């Protein structure tokens, strides 16, 4: 196997990883502590003094975590017994064995950035589960729900578009169907801009109708493998036996507006018969501020269904029906909230890898998935995507991502360098997007 480059880390002063660890992560921790403070009366109403004491305990644990981060203390093992605790602690030991630091301890600014961020969110979860009876509390729930409520006009526009499309879908010729598929893929791409971890938990609602902006946004798609996706799925549709299935898996990113765009794409896949089943993978615990959990998934569908708007409500009712019929299936797996890069999946989570191998196509949404697919390493811009996947090839896959981290592969020679020279922050603001495919052509 080819030598893989070093991991991105906070050692590179001034890098996006460094600034994330120095500024954004402490800001997110401060917001989490503030959220717990603001819910103090709710905890008292539900649980009496016990709830208030639990809130104090959680805040104390989180304040300690913030201090560890800001003073670059060594990582400490997880202590609360949870389904993934042993795997986490083994990984922390493994990472420590790789370090050349004088005391051989993993620290915030010297460890791989991917590990640092995942560890921080896992420690937030530990602080909550160590504080019963408020151990059920999702510290990011409010901001995820605000993102959804703040995007109502855009959601109504998308639901209306989808319902009108479904009503005429049988009259569309192949080129028209392809155009609509590409349109909804692009909406799912730009929906990925709504990332609350990038904004430090500040509002990132979608206030404009993305449908009207697609032409203007096209120049910002750096890699466009949508044709490969169409070719793959339309071929599956043409050659499918009557009783056989075409499975598309979507590894989700953000809840709120982005999740709506993903569900609209998933609805279109069924309505157009490009797929017969859509499987969704979310996070088992609150993660990276806005990532989708099973609670977020069910809550959002319920909200859409109970909307006062005719077409929005119809979408929600349809989506609920798909779930009842088994055409949409939501899966939980702890692997998605581990710090491992995806090339480790066959060893760490062979059951999940075997499940992914059943897919005809896997869509990986967002930046964290891209970082884990490529190992979050200092790859050259022109390294082929297939190579950067480092042996992770369960099924044909495509990453749909707006760029918010200093990692990108598969570009034309000189393309990344040119962008860097003209626009130093081109790969960290969400301005540019990619559809990057790996699989048979």
Swiss-Prot record:
Residue numbers binding S-adenosyl-L-methionine: 258, 291
Binding sites annotated in the UniProt record for substrate: 253-254, 367-371, 404
Residues annotated with N6-acetyllysine modification: 40
Gene Ontology terms, MF aspect: enzyme binding; fructose 6-phosphate aldolase activity; fructose-1-phosphatase activity; metal ion binding; phosphatase activity; protein carboxyl O-methyltransferase activity; protein-glutamate O-methyltransferase activity; S-adenosylmethionine-dependent methyltransferase activity
Modification sites for Phosphoserine: 102
One matching Pfam family: ARMT1-like_dom
Catalytically driven reaction(s): beta-D-fructose 1-phosphate + H2O = D-fructose + phosphate; beta-D-fructose 6-phosphate = dihydroxyacetone + D-glyceraldehyde 3-phosphate; L-glutamyl-[protein] + S-adenosyl-L-methionine = [protein]-L-glutamate 5-O-methyl ester + S-adenosyl-L-homocysteine
Keyword check for Transferase: yes
Family membership: Belongs to the damage-control phosphatase family. Sugar phosphate phosphatase III subfamily.
Assigned EC number: 3.1.3.-, 2.1.1.-
Signal sequence coordinates: none
Keywords: Acetylation, DNA damage, Hydrolase, Manganese, Metal-binding, Methylation, Methyltransferase, Nickel, Phosphoprotein, S-adenosyl-L-methionine, Transferase
Motif (Subfamily III RTxK motif): 401-404
Modified residues (N-acetylalanine): 2
Keyword Nucleotide-binding: no
Cited function: Metal-dependent phosphatase that shows phosphatase activity against several substrates, including fructose-1-phosphate and fructose-6-phosphate. Its preference for fructose-1-phosphate, a strong glycating agent that causes DNA damage rather than a canonical yeast metabolite, suggests a damage-control function in hexose phosphate metabolism. Has also been shown to have O-methyltransferase activity that methylates glutamate residues of target proteins to form gamma-glutamyl methyl ester residues. Possibly methylates PCNA, suggesting it is involved in the DNA damage response.
Protein name stated in the entry: Damage-control phosphatase ARMT1
Domain text: Subfamily III proteins have a conserved RTxK motif about 40-50 residues from the C-terminus; the threonine may be replaced by serine or cysteine.
Binding-site list for Mn(2+): 253-254, 291
Matching InterPro entries: ARMT-1-like_metal-bd_sf, ARMT1, ARMT1-like_metal-bd
Cofactor: Mn(2+); Ni(2+)
Biological process according to GO: DNA damage response; methylation
Post-translational modification: Automethylated.
């Amino acid at each position: 196997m080819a030598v893989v480059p070093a991991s991105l880390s906070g050692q590179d002063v001034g890098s996006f990883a460094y600034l994330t660890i120095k500024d954004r992560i402490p800001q997110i921790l401060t917001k989490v502590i503030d959220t717990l403070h603001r819910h103090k009366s709710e905890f008292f109403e539900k649980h009496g003094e016990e709830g208030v004491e639990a809130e104090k305990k959680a805040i104390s644990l989180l304040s300690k975590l913030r201090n560890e981060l800001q003073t670059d203390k060594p990582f400490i093992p997880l202590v609360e017994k949870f389904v993934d605790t042993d795997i986490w602690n083994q990984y922390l030991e493994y990472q420590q064995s790789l370090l050349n630091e004088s005391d051989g301890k993993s620290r915030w600014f010297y460890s791989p950035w991917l590990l640092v961020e995942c560890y921080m969110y896992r420690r937030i979860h530990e602080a909550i589960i160590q504080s019963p009876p408020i151990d059920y509390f999702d510290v990011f729930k409010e901001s995820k729900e605000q993102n959804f409520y703040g995007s109502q006009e855009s959601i109504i526009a998308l639901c209306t578009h989808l319902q009108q499309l479904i009503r005429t879908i049988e009259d569309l010729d192949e080129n028209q169907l392809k155009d609509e598929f590409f349109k909804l893929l692009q909406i799912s791409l730009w929906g990925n801009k709504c990332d609350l971890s990038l904004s430090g938990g500040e509002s990132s609602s979608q206030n404009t109708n993305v449908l009207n902006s697609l032409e203007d946004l096209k120049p910002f798609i750096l890699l466009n493998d949508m044709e490969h996706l169409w070719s793959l799925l339309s071929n599956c549709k043409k050659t499918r036996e009557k009783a056989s299935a075409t499975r598309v898996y979507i590894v989700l990113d953000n809840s709120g507006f982005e999740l709506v765009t993903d569900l609209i794409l998933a609805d279109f896949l069924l309505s157009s018969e490009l797929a017969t089943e859509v499987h969704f993978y979310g996070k088992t615990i609150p993660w990276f501020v806005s990532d989708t959990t099973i609670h977020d998934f069910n809550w959002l569908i319920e909200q859409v269904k109970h909307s006062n708007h005719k077409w929005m409500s119809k979408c929600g009712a349809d989506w609920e029906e798909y779930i009842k019929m088994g055409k949409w299936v939501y899966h939980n797996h702890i692997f998605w909230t581990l710090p491992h890069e995806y090339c480790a999946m066959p060893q760490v989570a062979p059951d999940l890898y075997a499940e992914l191998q059943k897919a005809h196509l896997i869509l990986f949404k967002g930046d964290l998935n891209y970082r884990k697919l490529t190992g979050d390493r200092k790859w050259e811009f022109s390294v082929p995507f297939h190579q950067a996947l480092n042996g992770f090839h369960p099924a044909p896959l495509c990453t749909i991502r707006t760029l918010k981290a200093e990692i990108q592969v598969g570009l034309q020679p000189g393309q990344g360098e040119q962008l860097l020279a003209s626009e130093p922050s081109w790969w960290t603001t969400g301005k540019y997007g990619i559809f990057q495919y790996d699989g048979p052509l």
